[in-house]
Structures are given as structure tokens and as C-alpha cells.
């Protein structure tokens, strides 16, 4: 059996799912740590927390001072990987508190989460995938109706593994108001943007609509029932100089990674 079809979890028991509704970040963080302490001692069950947060910025361990809000908005410093991000209404947040199979492979675990979210977005009709060297789920850059759209992230992932147990997780922008990202450098990436399911599909896509599909996909991915496949997006760049001097149309350079 290949690693792509093996469970990423130590326990064969089913994952428990808790729907917490809208909950403050610190309260949800406390719940994460409570569950993680139990799982580290082989007590309780692996649990997927699904929720929304009131608007809040959280900064991972690699956040640089220049990544932080330009308007002085407070930030909660957390112990996950990655840099700064925004959470808020209209964004589905998932925290799988899971004791990982041994030997612990954090990269493989992150790829499982990405696979689950790529599957959900693809089933909705969105062309998306991974970007080499960047976690999360991305849409390729494109030139649409005269407007250049850079690569943009629809789902972010940031995790921590402590005593063999994964904490933190993912966020999927459903019908979020994306202006919350304007005051920061999301995930510390300056040459890309953020987007939402609603923006890409041209209709209102709610947290309630996608929650069942996300739940099923995350559970299947972690249990090895949803194999990890290659989903690297096509990298497209816009050569503005060439567009302005040699042609009325933009020039694209495409590179396939993977």
C-alpha cells in the first residue's frame, strides 16, 4: 500500500466532528489545545472542529514585522506555521486535531488537507491546485475582461504538530468580505492575491453550503480514501513591457510545475 492511500492518522477510530458555529479565536484555540492534550495521551478521539471566527488577524511563527496590519489593528500571535492571515465571517475554518501516524510526516499531512480542499473546489467548477513552494489552494493567474488577475489563494493552511498531534488547520473563503486582507501581506506573499468561492463562481456560496462536502473530503483524505494527486497549477506571468510596446495583447509565459 502506497503512502498516498494509507491513513495519515494513528487511530483507526472514526473522526469526530464538532460544529462550533461562530466562536472567538482564543476560545477555539483553547478547545484545540484541550483536545490535543488528550490525543497526545491516547485519550479521546481525533476531532475535526468546523467553525467561523469573528474578524481577527492571526500571525504564525514566520510573520515579519512588515507583514502586519498597516493600521495598527491588533494581531493574535499563534504557534502554527506560516505567516499572517485574516479570519472572519463567510470563511469556513477547520481544525483537525489528529494524532498522526508514525513516522510523523507533516508535509504529507498538509498535502492531504490541500487535496481535500482542491477536490471540493474542483467539484464546484473552480480550476485550482497547488503552487510549488506555497501551501494552500490556488487559482492560476489569468487575463479576464481586460483585467490581469494574479495567482490567488482561495484556501490557506497552517499547522503545528506537537507530541505527534496536529493542531490548527485550514480556512476556505466562501463568501467572505475580502477587504480584511487589504491591511496585511496575506501569508507574507507579495506577488499574489486572495479570492473566494463566491467571487470566482459569480454567486453566493455560503459556509453552510460547502461544509458537508469539506467534512467528507477532509475525513476521506486523512483516512487515505482520497488519494493525493498532482494538482500543480499552470504558472502564468504577464509581461507588461511587451504588452505595452509590441502588441495590444498581453504576453504570457507558462511554466508547468510538478
UniProtKB/Swiss-Prot annotation:
Alphabetized Pfam families for the sequence: LplA-B_cat (PF21948)
Family matches, as PROSITE patterns: BPL_LPL_CATALYTIC (PS51733), LIPB (PS01313)
Pathway(s) it belongs to: Protein modification; protein lipoylation via endogenous pathway; protein N(6)-(lipoyl)lysine from octanoyl-[acyl-carrier-protein]: step 1/2
Broad enzyme group: transferase
Annotated residues for binding of substrate: 80-87, 156-158, 169-171
GO biological process: protein modification process
Swiss-Prot/TrEMBL site (Lowers pKa of active site Cys) positions: 153
All residue ranges annotated as the BPL/LPL catalytic domain in the record: 42-226
Other facts noted in the record for this chain: In the reaction, the free carboxyl group of octanoic acid is attached via an amide linkage to the epsilon-amino group of a specific lysine residue of lipoyl domains of lipoate-dependent enzymes.
Protein name: Octanoyltransferase
Lineage: Bacteria, Bacillati, Actinomycetota, Actinomycetes, Mycobacteriales
This protein's encoding gene: lipB
Amino acid at each position: 500500500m502506497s503512502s498516498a492511500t494509507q491513513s495519515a492518522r494513528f487511530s483507526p477510530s472514526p473522526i469526530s466532528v464538532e460544529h462550533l458555529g461562530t466562536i472567538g479565536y482564543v476560545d477555539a484555540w483553547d478547545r484545540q489545545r484541550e483536545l490535543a492534550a488528550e490525543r497526545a495521551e491516547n485519550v479521546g478521539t481525533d476531532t475535526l472542529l468546523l467553525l467561523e471566527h469573528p474578524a481577527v488577524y492571526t500571525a504564525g511563527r514566520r510573520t515579519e514585522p512588515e507583514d502586519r496590519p498597516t493600521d495598527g489593528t491588533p494581531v493574535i500571535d499563534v504557534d502554527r506555521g506560516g505567516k499572517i492571515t485574516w479570519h472572519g465571517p463567510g470563511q469556513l475554518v477547520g481544525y483537525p486535531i489528529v494524532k498522526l501516524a508514525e513516522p510523523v510526516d507533516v508535509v504529507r499531512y498538509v498535502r492531504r488537507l490541500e487535496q481535500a480542499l482542491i477536490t471540493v473546489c474542483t467539484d464546484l467548477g473552480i480550476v485550482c491546485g497547488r503552487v510549488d513552494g506555497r501551501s494552500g489552494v490556488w487559482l492560476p493567474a489569468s487575463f479576464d475582461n481586460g483585467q490581469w488577475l494574479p495567482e490567488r489563494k482561495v484556501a490557506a493552511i497552517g499547522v503545528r504538530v506537537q507530541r505527534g498531534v496536529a493542531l490548527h488547520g485550514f480556512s476556505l473563503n466562501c463568501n467572505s468580505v475580502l477587504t480584511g486582507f487589504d491591511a496585511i501581506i496575506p501569508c507574507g506573499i507579495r506577488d499574489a492575491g486572495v479570492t473566494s468561492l463566491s467571487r470566482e463562481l459569480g454567486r453566493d456560496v455560503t459556509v453552510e453550503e460547502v461544509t458537508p462536502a469539506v467534512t467528507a473530503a477532509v475525513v476521506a483524505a486523512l483516512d487515505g480514501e482520497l488519494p493525493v494527486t498532482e494538482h500543480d497549477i499552470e504558472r502564468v506571468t504577464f509581461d507588461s513591457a511587451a504588452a505595452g510596446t509590441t502588441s495590444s495583447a498581453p504576453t504570457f509565459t507558462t511554466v508547468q510545475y510538478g
